[in-house]
Amino acid sequence: MFSRFHALFLLLVLSVRTYKCVSSSSSSSSSFSFSSFSSSSSSQTLVLPLKTRITPTDHRPTDKLHFHHNVTLTVTLTVGTPPQNISMVIDTGSELSWLRCNRSSNPNPVNNFDPTRSSSYSPIPCSSPTCRTRTRDFLIPASCDSDKLCHATLSYADASSSEGNLAAEIFHFGNSTNDSNLIFGCMGSVSGSDPEEDTKTTGLLGMNRGSLSFISQMGFPKFSYCISGTDDFPGFLLLGDSNFTWLTPLNYTPLIRISTPLPYFDRVAYTVQLTGIKVNGKLLPIPKSVLVPDHTGAGQTMVDSGTQFTFLLGPVYTALRSHFLNRTNGILTVYEDPDFVFQGTMDLCYRISPVRIRSGILHRLPTVSLVFEGAEIAVSGQPLLYRVPHLTVGNDSVYCFTFGNSDLMGMEAYVIGHHHQQNMWIEFDLQRSRIGLAPVECDVSGQRLGIGS
C-alpha cells in the first residue's frame, strides 16, 4: 500500500511463529541471525508463510470515502522489554512503522503496545536529528508536542489516519538473539475505514525506501514475496537474498529515482516505468507521454503489495476498458447498473452464473499484460475478474474487471496491486535499485522452501 492507502477487506497474516531459515542453494533449516542481512553476501534468508482471513465488507462507516482497501499483510512479533506480542501490517508503500499505543492497567492489553510496561522504550525529542531531518519524506511534516516530543501524523486516501510520538524500541525477531532497536511511531490515535477491523491490528510495518522504514533501518539488501491467491497455501514473504538454483530467472525493471521533490511524486515508493499495455499480445494505442510522470510528478507507476487491485489514470483505463469490453462481447453479459461502481473505482462488471464459472468461461478471457522496461506482468483467467461479495442478480453473481480508474480516487498515479501479482516471484533489490519479476507457482516454491504442504 503506498503511503496514502490502508487495506482492510482480505487479511493475509504472516505467522512469525513458524520461522524458516534456508540457504541460497537448499531448503534445509538452519539457525538464523538477523545481522547476516546487513550484507548482500549473506547465504541465509528468512521465510514467513502467509495465512488468509476474510473480513466482512459491510462495516464501513458512511462518512468515509467510497474507496477502501482490501488486503493487508501482517506479521506477528514481540516488542519491548519484557516483550509484548503485537501484529503489524506490512506495507511496501509506507515509511514509518507504528504501533497502536495504550497505557493500560491490563497486564497484556489486546492489540495495543503499552510503553509504560517497557524499560527499553525511549521517546524521541523534537530537537533530535531524527525528528528534524529523517521525517522529511512524510506527507505531513513532523511537529513538536507540548512535551517537546516528536509528533507524527499519517493520513490515507480512505480517510484513515494515525498520530502519535516517534520513539525507539527493541523489536524481537523469532528466536534471534540479534534484536534491533528501531525508530517507530507510538500512536495514541488511530482512525480507519473499518473500526471493527482496526481493533484487530496493532500497527504497521513500513517497507518502502524511506530512511525510517523497517527495511532501511534493518539494512536488508533484498526482500521478496510470492502470493498464490489460494486458501490452501496463500504464499510467503522472504527477507534476504533469493539466489536459489531452482528459481526461474528473474526479469528486472529499474526503480525510478528523482532528485528534485515534486508535489505528486512519492520519492520513496517502489516506482517503475510502465511502457505499455497489451491485450492478447497486442499493444494498445496509448501515447507514451501519458505513461510518463509529468512536471508535477503525476503519473508515476508504483508496485504496491498493500493495494489489492490495479489502478490506471483515466485515459489509459478508458482505453483498456473499451478494448476489454469489445473482446468479451459475446462471452460475458455486462451488469447494467449505471449507479454501481465497485469500490468507487471499477465500473465494468458482468453477470455470470455458477454454471458458466464451472464450465471454465474465465479461461476464455483475453490476457492483459502490463509492460515495463525489461519485464512484464501478464494477467489472465480468474485474476481478471473479482466476485463482488453478497451481490447477486437472480442466479447470477456479479464479477468486476480488476482494473480501476485512478481518477475516481482523486489519485494522480498508476498502482500495480497484489491481485495482479499472484503466482509471481516479486523481488525488491534495494542494493541495485530494481524489481525482479518471474512467473512461478507459489505453492511449489513454498514446498521448496520447506513451508508448503
Curated annotation (Swiss-Prot):
Predominant localisation class: endoplasmic reticulum
EC numbers, comma separated: 3.4.23.-
Residues annotated as domain Peptidase A1: 73-438
Main function: Embryo-specific aspartic protease that limits programmed cell death during reproductive development. Possesses peptidase activity toward casein in vitro.
CDD domains found in the cross-reference section: pepsin_A_like_plant
Protein name (database record): Aspartic proteinase PCS1
UniProt subcellular location: Endoplasmic reticulum
Note: Ectopic expression of PCS1 induces survival of cells of the anther wall including stomium and septum cells. This leads to a failure in anther dehiscence and subsequent male sterility.
